[in-house]
């Protein structure tokens, strides 16, 4: 019935569904079947972004905004070995540079989710591998704020 377009809700008795909860498997199944997933907002954008990413959520780290210059490469090198799912905030002006850095430090095939304007009218989430996003964000005039969720190292 979900594939026919009916709207359903996923409710957990243990907090936000799919955060340290097997509900993420349902979210992943929906994503794999091209079913849109939305999340009711909480106090921050990072939890809804993680909840709808389809990436492992039992252990994660919130990195916020990466350093702009000093320490950026060092931090990315450290994070390239991180096994937990990582969550980043990014501005529209630096999104392409950050994705390029992710490509260089994490590799082209690392799975990511990019959410834009969560809980707003132009909310959008795209999922794939880092290499899938470079062309789509190069030389684009973007608006809005982004949350990037990156799968940890296997």
Model-derived regions, located:
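Class I S-adenosyl-L-methionine
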Residues: 1-36
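Short, hinge-like loop/turn segments at secondary-structure boundaries
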Residues: 2, 26-29, 53-58, 105-106, ...
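A contiguous loop/helix-start segment that scaffolds small-molecule binding in enzyme catalytic cores
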Residues: 3-7, 85, 89-154
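Structural detector of well-ordered beta-strand residues that form the stable sheet scaffold
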Residues: 11, 36-40, 87, 113
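Helical mechanochemical/support elements of P-loop NTPase systems and associated helical scaffolds
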Residues: 15, 22, 68, 72-75, ...
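Short gly/pro/ser/thr-enriched loop/turn and capping motifs at secondary-structure boundaries
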Residues: 17, 44-47, 120-121
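Short, well-ordered secondary-structure micro-motifs
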Residues: 21, 49-51, 73-74, 98-100, ...
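Class I SAM-dependent methyltransferase SAM-binding "motif I" and its flanking Rossmann-like core
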Residues: 25-82
């Amino acid at each position: 019935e979900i594939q026919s377009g009916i709207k359903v809700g996923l409710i957990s008795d243990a907090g936000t569904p799919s955060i340290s909860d097997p509900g993420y498997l349902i979210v992943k199944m929906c994503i794999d079947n091209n079913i849109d997933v939305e999340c009711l907002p909480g106090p921050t954008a990072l939890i809804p972004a993680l909840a709808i990413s389809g990436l492992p959520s039992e252990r994660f780290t919130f990195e916020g905004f990466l350093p702009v210059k000093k320490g950026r490469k060092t931090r990315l090198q450290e994070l390239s070995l991180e096994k937990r799912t990582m969550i980043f905030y990014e501005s529209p002006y630096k999104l392409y540079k950050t994705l390029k850095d992710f490509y260089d430090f994490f590799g082209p095939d690392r799975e990511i989710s990019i959410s834009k304007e969560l809980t707003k009218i132009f909310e959008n989430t795209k999922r794939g591998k880092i290499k899938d996003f470079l062309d789509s964000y190069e030389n684009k005039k973007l608006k809005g704020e982004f949350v990037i969720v990156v799968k940890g190292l296997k």
